[in-house]
Amino acid sequence: MANNSSYGENVRRKSHTPSAIVIGSGFAGIAAANALRNASFEVVLLESRDRIGGRIHTDYSFGFPVDLGASWLHGVCEENPLAPIIGRLGLPLYRTSGDDSVLFDHDLESYALYDTKGHQVPQELVEKIGKVFETILEETGKLREETKEDISIAKAIAIVMERNPHLRQEGIAHDVLQWYLCRMEGWFATDADAISLQGWDQEVLLPGGHGLMVRGYRPVINTLAKGLDIRLGHRVVEIVRHRNRVEVTVSSGKTFVADAAVIAVPLGVLKANTIKFEPRLPEWKEEAIRELSVGVENKIILHFSEVFWPNVEFLGVVSSTTYGCSYFLNLHKATGHPVLVYMPAGRLACDIEKLSDEAAAQFAFSQLKKILPNAAEPIHYLVSHWGSDENTLGSYTFDGVGKPRDLYEKLRIPVDNLFFAGEATSVQYTGTVHGAFSTGLMAAEECRMRVLERFRELDMLEMCHPAMGEQTATVSVPLLISRL
C-alpha cells in the first residue's frame, strides 16, 4: 500500500470502496478491523506501540509464554464469543475454577495462606472465613436494598459488621478475612473504598468458570490480525470529524483520511485527553469518559530454577489490612514451568509502579519469603506497569461509587462517524477480553451500516457476524480444558 499522506479518501472517490481507520490494536481494535476488512472495507489500523495486542501482552523471554496482561478466559463455555477461535486453534486452557462466582473464589479452587511469620493458616479456618466473607457480601446486598444512595463496599462491610457482631473476626481470622477482601480488590483492580456497593456484582458472568490461556493470548490476537494493514508506532494525537469523512493525525504529522473511524483505545488514554477531538465530543460523551473509573492491577512474574512451593493454585500472605496482604498465582500447575506471579492491585499496585523493576521484583520476592523463608532467588523476572504506561494508563474499568451504569453505554454510543469500542464500552462484560472483543464487532457493524447507508448501498455487502469470514465456520471445535 502506498505510503501517501492521506488514506481512504481517494480510494472512496474513485471506486466508492468504503473505508475506515481503527485506532488501537487491542482485542477490540483487532476485532473491529478484522470485521470491517471481511466486509470489504479498506481498513488501516493505527497502533502507538511497537507491537499489537494492547493489554494483551504475551512475553517469551523466559523461553516459554507468560502473559503480562490479560491471561484468563472468563467463561469457559461455547457461549463465550472467543471460544470458536480458541477451539479451532487448539489452544489449551487450564481451568482454575469451575465456579463463576466473584464473591471470593472467582478464579481459584485451592490455595495455601500463611501469616507474616511463615506459619500456614489451617485450611479449616480458611474455608470457614471464606463462608463468613460470602455471608458478609450477602448482607451488603440487603443493605443495598435499604437505600438508593450508593456507598463503597468497604463502608457497606463496616455497617454489616456493626449490625452483626457475630461476623466480626479477631486475630488470624481477621487477617484471613482481609485477604479475601484483598482478592476482591484484585478482581476490580482497585481498593474496597472505591468499589460501588450498587454496581459491584452487576456484570454478566458466563458459565463454565475461569480458564488460564496456557500458551498465552498472543496466538489468538495474531490470528485475528493476519492480513490487516497495521501501522505500528503511529500515536494518534488528533481526530477531526466531518460529515462524510474523518481525518486522523498521528504524532509524526501524517494524516489518514477515511469514511469513519473506530476508536478502541483504553479508557485511561481517553481520560488523559492525549487525543484532541475536533469538534469536541458532546458533553454526554465527555461525561462518560470523565466519570467512568479505571483501576490498576499489575503482575510481577518470578521465574525460578525449580519448584519449591506447595502444589496449589494460589499462595497468599494474610495481614491485618488488605494493603499488607498479597497473593501469588502458581503457573506451574497450568504450564509446568516454575513460575509464580505476584498480583498487586489498587493503591499497592500504584505504589509499586514507582519502584524500579529490580526493586519491584525484590519486593515481590520479599512477600514470598514471608511464606517460604528458604525460597531460592528467582533467575528471571518481568514487571508490568499498566497504570503508568502512556499507552494504557490503567488496567481495566470498574464500577465506581455513585456512578450510574449507563456510563458504559454512553461511552459506546457513536458520535457521527466515530465509533467506540473496548472493554470499558461493554455493559455486560466490562473488564474482560471477550467483552472487548464483542464491542469491537459491534462497533464494526455499526460503522458498516452507517457508511453503507450513506453510500445507499446497504445491499452491496453482507457481513458475517461475528465478522471473521471463513474463521467463523459453523463447525464448533471443543475447548481443550485441563486440570493438572
Curated annotation (Swiss-Prot):
A motif (Microbody targeting signal) lies at residues 482-484. It is found in: Peroxisome. InterPro entries: Amino_oxidase, FAD/NAD-bd_sf, Flavin_amine_oxidase, Flavin_monoamine_oxidase. FAD binds at E47, R55, V236, E423. This is Polyamine oxidase 3. Binds 1 FAD per subunit. It comes from Oryza sativa subsp. japonica. Pathway: Amine and polyamine degradation; spermine degradation; Amine and polyamine degradation; spermidine degradation. Its EC number is 1.5.3.-. Belongs to the flavin monoamine oxidase family. The keyword Translocase does not apply. It catalyses: spermine + O2 + H2O = 3-aminopropanal + spermidine + H2O2; N(1)-acetylspermine + O2 + H2O = 3-acetamidopropanal + spermidine + H2O2; norspermine + O2 + H2O = norspermidine + 3-aminopropanal + H2O2; spermidine + O2 + H2O = 3-aminopropanal + putrescine + H2O2. Its cofactor is FAD.
